[in-house]
Amino acid sequence: DITAQVQQLVGRSGVKTGLCHLFIHHTSASLLITENADPEVHRDLERFMARIVPDGDPLFKHDEEGPDDMPAHVRAVLTQTSLAVPVAGGRCDLGTWQGIYVWEHRHAAHHRRVTVTVLGS
């Protein structure tokens, strides 16, 4: 959950009304806005994605980094590598139950870089 860090960056930008754009610099992770109240939502999303893009599928030949390598790329393609969030009142204008997340598609945690650009006045 990177919501607090993003809100802090938006606040420091001085922009009151505008747009916050986020971009992840990786091909095996993605960004999403989803419910922030019930952790079961995240587990359900993981289970769903594992069902439609299973690790170790013999269809995938790109497996140099392990059986989760190519499935992670496919999962990233099926989701989002960038987000655009409106800024109002100097904050990301998210719904009550919305949070901004980096979704890691590999089994092991990796360092991920996200660029946040805030535009507006």
Name what the model sees in each region.
Residues 1-121:
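Active-site histidine-anchored catalytic micro-motif
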